[in-house]
């Protein structure tokens, strides 16, 4: 199995700020990394797949980077609507493996 270590567990930044979330895989997953946004009572929303490809309709304020074992999600120009929990998912032929999540608090 692949262990996905996601940091930080929570982060608080003001509107207009920038948040960086890191995800480390216990073994190489090449570019098999996706990022999701989850809000209470709503299904997870795919933000980025293949490490850096923006999903349809997602703001370009969200940027994914990395390959192998080290990946990063950067959210720039934060908006109140970005307050949510963010998860990484590493995919291999053996299945999908999720990070522990990062709660993003946006201070208005």
From Swiss-Prot:
Keyword Aminoacyl-tRNA synthetase on this protein? no
Q: Region Framework-2: start and end of each range?
A: 35-49
Q: Name one Pfam family in it.
A: V-set
Q: Record's GO cellular component, any one?
A: immunoglobulin complex
- Ranges where the record places region Complementarity-determining-1: 24-34
Keyword check for Kinase, yes or no.
no
Region: Complementarity-determining-2, residue numbers: 50-56
- The segment annotated Framework-1 runs over 1-23
Q: Where is this region: Framework-3?
A: 57-88
Question: Residue span of the signal peptide, if any?
Answer: none
What are the recorded Gene Ontology BP terms?
A: adaptive immune response
Please list where the region (Framework-4) is annotated.
98-107
Q: Which InterPro entries match?
A: Ig-like_dom, Ig-like_dom_sf, Ig-like_fold, Ig_sub, Ig_V-set, IgV_Light_Chain
What keywords are assigned to this protein? Adaptive immunity, Disulfide bond, Immunity, Immunoglobulin
Q: Which SMART domains match?
A: IG (SM00409), IGv (SM00406)
Where is region (Complementarity-determining-3) located? 89-97
Q: Which cysteines are joined by disulfide bonds?
A: 23-88, 80-108
Extra facts: This chain was obtained from antibody to type III pneumococci and was isolated from the serum of a single rabbit.
Name the chain's protein: Ig kappa chain V region BS-1
The species this protein belongs to is Oryctolagus cuniculus (Rabbit)
């Amino acid at each position: 199995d692949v262990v996905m270590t996601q940091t930080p567990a929570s982060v608080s930044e003001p509107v207009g700020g920038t948040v960086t979330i890191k995800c480390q895989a216990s073994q190489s997953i090449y570019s098999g990394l996706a990022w999701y946004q989850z809000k209470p009572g709503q299904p997870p929303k795919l933000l980025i797949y293949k490490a850096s490809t923006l999903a349809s309709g997602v703001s370009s304020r969200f940027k994914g980077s990395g390959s192998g074992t080290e990946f990063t999600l950067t959210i720039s120009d934060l908006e109140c609507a970005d307050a949510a929990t963010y998860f990484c998912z590493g995919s291999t032929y053996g299945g999908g493996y999720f990070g522990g999540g990062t709660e993003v608090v946006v201070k208005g």
